[in-house]
Amino acid sequence: MTAELRNLPHIASMAFNEPLMLEPAYARVFFCALAGQLGISRLTDAVSGDSLTAGEAPTALALSGDDDGPRQARSYQVMNGIAVLPVSGTLVSRTRALQPYSGMTGYNGIIARLQQAASDPMVDGILLDMDTPGGMVAGAFDCADIIARVRDIKPVWALANDMNCSAGQLLASAASRRLVTQTARTGSIGVMMAHSNYGAALEKQGVEITLIYSGSHKVDGNPYSHLPGDVRETLQSRMDATRRMFAQKVSAYTGLSVQAVLDTEAAVYSGQEAIDAGLADELVNSTDAITVMRDALDARKSRLSGGRMTKETQSTTVS
């Protein structure tokens, strides 16, 4: 396993005391798995006080099919004129790979593939094939804005296949149109943060940590003591502000009101429920997604061509 994947201090620095946009069940799996690696003996839900237990990790699904052209020059498949961009696993700020890699996808890779597809003459539209519980806040909003920017160049659709939660929902909201499968899990428009406290464990081992610092907030949220009330309030305010920013983005992209988005209270929706909540547009079988998008693009092209022909005919008649 590479150093990048086993750099536990780096992983911990991104997982703790940082806002995350994760589907709740996946968050439990994630932190329970990470706890075993970091020697954390107990995980507690700060809201309910319950201990967290791990469930089953999500399984990635992806569309498959023949590429319209040679793949070596592209970082995505082109199927019937549609660039298919897989977005699976945990979403992180950046990775070394453009494609999903070792259970995660980098926002930097999504942006790079979007920009390449937007300028590809063989691509008429872009489909984000998504199976993600969400991930890091860092980079998510910028990535969503790029999706919204690219959709003004070429249609960008999102397919929840079979999960599209939290940060994934943010990205999907920025798309021109959102498809969901009948069992797809979507929504979870909220933010969370975890704080770790190693103080008791270190004391049992006879280890005492002394923090020497300058600046009253320099060691806020440090993992060697309980979280003080005032620091927790500050972190809670940060979560609330990020959640509101999340809701504002979804509102701007989808046309839903900010209050309607906030009123979801980070609920997770399944299939048709997402359409009823205004977070998705159409229920499809994942194997039909390419055909559905292709038919829509052809119909749009036909309408535009018909409109141009009508104007040209009128112009000729007037002349």
Segments and roles (model prediction):
Residues M1-S319:
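N-terminal organellar transit peptides
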